[in-house]
């Protein structure tokens, strides 16, 4: 069943003042017509369409018996087949004035005239149609001053409301004036109102005429307010449109007058400058044609238009880009070597590769050179290497920071249709450099993110691919720009963070951490002079002896790079600067024993001997994104049921390494002289300190084996040894990565002997010579080699001894 409330006003009309009679008797059931979204008032005429199956039968029964219908509103319009409980209790008795069946869809169209109110009493079942016992509610015709006064006000307010309707005529006002009964007047006006069916039902259920008039008055007042507000909004909108059209017409007339008088100097000057800039930019023909077309649009555009400034900004971007390729300076390899040696200490392998790169470019300037990616921990000189390449090539240097970039538009730019659109970071950097053959450093390439606005790493593929970047198209520019002459250099901390397709387009150069000797040389050559200048001091005012500098490196920093070292040196010089500012004649010599009063207590000290003085404690080596580090592993045994307890936030790989190590120890009880008959009566607890730091990796197997074996043998591990390597269940020591970083970490921690897999022997060539000379390396084929080398021969008498 559907009843469209939008059709109510079009076919509603007053039916007169006399109370209509009905052929239904109070003791006969009344056939019900449930409706969804319309309320029929007494005296009103409404069209209905019966489309639901049961409702069709109800209508047919009423027409066949020539009986009236009980039109009643459903409580929930979503109910398809309403029951007695789904209907409101008060409805309107209606006579069927007209009835037509549609041949297309079989729907029943009928026009009903409301007669009087009724109240549902009880449903009547078994008739084949929906019917109910009802109680008629005849309209009271008693008149009193209160009712008459409200009726008069309602008549006036209704006329006011009709006057605000856009297409209402005087016939409706005259029809309302002809109604004398106040109750019928209220019903008629309520039926005309555009208010929700629930509110109309509330008025229908108000039997007291005085209260009904009040409710209709409130509804009419609300509609008047809405109509007035709508009228005001419409007038304001029309006024704004008219004003805008008037202003546009006046501006066009003013522009015509100014053109005739030659007074439009400012915009003409701007167009003239852009025309000259296009001619001087030496753009490719395709780009120049596009720019002149945009300039023509600009000349025809009103200066006050919002598009005017956008077009000017776009043309400025096009003309300020370095389109022609400048002449390249010849590459001087000797000068390049001198620049690299002056700016960087150590890094011989990396500097040699950069010189090879420059040599190839000198011999084949038009060849497709590889893209170098400097990979290493923070503070080892990745960015400064890019600057040195730019100095050696005598090209401008520009840096593009990619850390945290998660929107593809930051690489390719935004389309001009967006408010505040700008070119991407690549084009912006080229304009900043002022040359199409600049050296561009893509910093923190491994920190590229990925969000809902696309994948920036995928956008970088077009930038770095030599086959595509000759016609790179920025979304803002909309024209191709040649990036093939740019020397791209990238930096990253972790290779895992670089997308695979990007890695394939680059040559990775590892920059390891510095040794203590290298840090000392870097501090003397670069950091100390730089911090002296930054603090406004001279060498005569502050003296930093070699012993003090080594103490700062050893006791106050422990990093792969030198940034923290530079901060500590700066803190010392700032302390001296304060003294000099107070007394210009001051000369300070900072001895090592004064560092504690300036920098505080020592932050790092060697604790290897203390940690490994007991059985079950071994020093392992770990690799981190910021360099190598020492990893202490502790094992202990307690009475229990043979459980293995692991703590220290170990990852899945390390947990499996401990399981494999324990199994290997059990399988070698005889050779290790361990009584394994009580394994099921003891729990073994393996702990890696610094439990707040997650740890994982495939290189702790040998260290785990040594820790458990040392514990069960009751023998301590040598305090000057550290070990790395993975194991198999056959006891074979497997190779691992990060050897150089791990060895340098051992050197910083005071370790003199490093045990590592024999298959990692070629990696020792990457370790600086001075570091190799200070250490002893033991190559392991099996875990038996590690036991012989690192576990002391004599048992330690301690409460930690375990007899299993």
Swiss-Prot record:
Q: Could you say which EC number(s) this protein's record lists? A: 3.4.21.53
Q: From the UniProt entry, list the residue stretches annotated as the region Disordered.
A: 1-23
Q: Where does ATP bind?
A: 376-383
One Gene Ontology term, aspect cellular component = cytoplasm
* Highest rank taxon of the organism: Bacteria
Please verify whether the record's keywords include Protease.
yes
Q: Which residues cross the membrane?
A: none
Location of the protein in the cell: Cytoplasm
Keyword Magnesium tagged = no
Chief place of localization: cytoplasm
Catalytic residues of the enzyme? 699, 742
Subunit record text: Homohexamer. Organized in a ring with a central cavity.
> What is the recorded function of this protein according to its Swiss-Prot or TrEMBL entry?
ATP-dependent serine protease that mediates the selective degradation of mutant and abnormal proteins as well as certain short-lived regulatory proteins. Required for cellular homeostasis and for survival from DNA damage and developmental changes induced by stress. Degrades polypeptides processively to yield small peptide fragments that are 5 to 10 amino acids long. Binds to DNA in a double-stranded, site-specific manner.
The family assignment reads:
Belongs to the peptidase S16 family.
The name on file for this protein is Lon protease
**Annotated organism of origin:** Paraburkholderia phytofirmans (strain DSM 17436 / LMG 22146 / PsJN)
Name of the gene this protein is made from: lon
């Amino acid at each position: 069943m559907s009843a469209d409330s939008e059709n109510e006003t079009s076919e509603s009309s007053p039916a007169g003042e006399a109370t209509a009679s009905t052929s239904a008797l109070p003791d006969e059931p009344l056939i019900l017509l449930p409706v969804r979204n319309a309320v029929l008032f007494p005296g009103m005429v409404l069209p209905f369409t019966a489309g639901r199956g049961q409702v069709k039968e109800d209508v047919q029964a009423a027409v066949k018996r020539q009986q009236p219908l009980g039109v009643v509103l459903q409580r929930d319009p979503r109910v398809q087949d309403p029951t007695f409980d789904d209907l409101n209790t008060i409805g309107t008795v209606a006579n069927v004035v007209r009835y037509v069946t549609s041949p297309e869809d079989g729907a029943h169209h009928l026009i009903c005239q409301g007669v009087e109110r009724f109240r549902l009493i009880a449903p009547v079942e078994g008739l084949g149609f929906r019917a109910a016992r009802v109680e008629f509610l005849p309209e009271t015709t008693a008149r009193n001053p209160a009712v008459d006064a409200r009726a008069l006000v309602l008549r006036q307010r209704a006329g006011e409301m009709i006057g605000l309707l856009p297409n209402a005529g005087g016939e409706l006002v005259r029809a309302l004036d002809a109604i004398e009964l106040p109750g019928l007047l209220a019903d008629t006006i309520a039926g005309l109102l555009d208010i929700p069916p629930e509110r109309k039902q509330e008025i229908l259920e108000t039997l007291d005429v005085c209260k009904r008039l009040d409710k209709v008055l409130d509804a009419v007042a609300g509609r008047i307010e809405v109509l007035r507000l709508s009228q005001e909004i419409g007038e304001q909108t029309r006024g704004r449109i008219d004003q805008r059209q008037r202003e546009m017409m006046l501006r066009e007339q003013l522009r015509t007058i100014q053109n005739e008088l030659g007074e439009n100097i400012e915009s003409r000057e701007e167009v003239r400058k852009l025309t000259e800039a296009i001619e001087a930019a030496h753009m490719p023909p395709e780009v120049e044609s596009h720019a002149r077309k945009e300039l023509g649009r600009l000349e025809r555009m009103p200066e006050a238009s919002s598009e005017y400034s956008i077009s000017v900004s776009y043309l400025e971007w096009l003309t300020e880009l370095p389109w022609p390729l400048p002449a390249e300076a010849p590459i001087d390899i000797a000068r390049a070597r001198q620049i690299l040696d002056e700016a960087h200490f150590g890094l011989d392998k990396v500097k040699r590769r950069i010189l090879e790169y420059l040599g190839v470019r000198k011999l084949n300037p038009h060849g497709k050179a590889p893209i170098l990616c400097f990979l290493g921990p923070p503070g080892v000189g990745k960015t400064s290497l890019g600057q040195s390449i730019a100095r050696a090539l005598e090209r401008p240097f520009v840096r593009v920071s990619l850390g945290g970039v998660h929107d593809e538009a930051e690489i390719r730019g935004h389309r001009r249709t967006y408010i505040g659109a700008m070119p991407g970071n690549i084009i912006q950097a080229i304009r900043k450099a002022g040359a199409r053959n600049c050296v561009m450093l893509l910093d923190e390439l491994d920190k590229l993110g990925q969000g809902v606005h696309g994948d920036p790493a995928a956008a970088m593929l077009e930038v770095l691919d030599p086959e595509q970047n000759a016609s790179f198209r920025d979304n803002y520019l909309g024209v191709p720009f040649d990036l093939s002459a740019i020397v791209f250099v990238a930096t990253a901390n972790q290779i895992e963070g670089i997308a695979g397709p990007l890695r394939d387009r680059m040559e990775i150069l590892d920059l390891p951490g510095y040794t203590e000797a290298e840090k000392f040389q870097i501090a003397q050559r670069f950091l100390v002079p730089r911090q002296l200048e930054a603090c406004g001091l001279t060498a005569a005012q502050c003296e930093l002896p070699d012993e003090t500098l080594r103490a700062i490196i050893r006791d106050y920093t422990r990093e792969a790079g030198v940034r923290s070292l530079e901060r500590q040196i700066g803190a010392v010089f700032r302390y001296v600067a304060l003294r000099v500012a107070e007394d210009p004649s001051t000369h300070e010599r900072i001895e090592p024993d004064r560092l504690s009063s300036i920098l505080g207590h020592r932050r790092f000290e060697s604790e290897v001997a203390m940690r490994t003085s007991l059985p079950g404690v071994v020093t392992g080596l770990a690799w981190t994104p910021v360099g190598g580090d020492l990893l202490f592993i502790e094992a202990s045994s307690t009475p229990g049921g043979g459980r293995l307890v692991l703590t220290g936030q170990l990852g899945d790989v390390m947990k499996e390494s401990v399981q494999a190590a324990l199994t290997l120890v059990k399988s070698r009880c005889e050779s290790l002289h361990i009584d394994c008959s009580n394994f099921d009566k003891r729990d073994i607890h393996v702990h890696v300190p610094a439990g707040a730091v997650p740890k994982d990796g495939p290189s702790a197997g040998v260290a785990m084996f040594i820790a458990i074996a040392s514990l069960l043998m009751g023998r301590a591990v040598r305090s000057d040894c550290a070990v790395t390597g993975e194991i198999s269940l056959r006891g074979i020591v497997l190779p691992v990565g990060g050897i150089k970083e791990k060895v340098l970490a051992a050197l910083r921690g005071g370790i003199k002997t490093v045990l590592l897999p024999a298959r990692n022997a070629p990696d020792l060539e990457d370790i600086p010579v001075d570091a190799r000379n200070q250490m002893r390396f033991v190559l392991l084929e099996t875990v038996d080699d590690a036991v012989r080398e690192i576990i002391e021969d004599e048992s330690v008498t301690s409460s930690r001894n375990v007899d299993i």
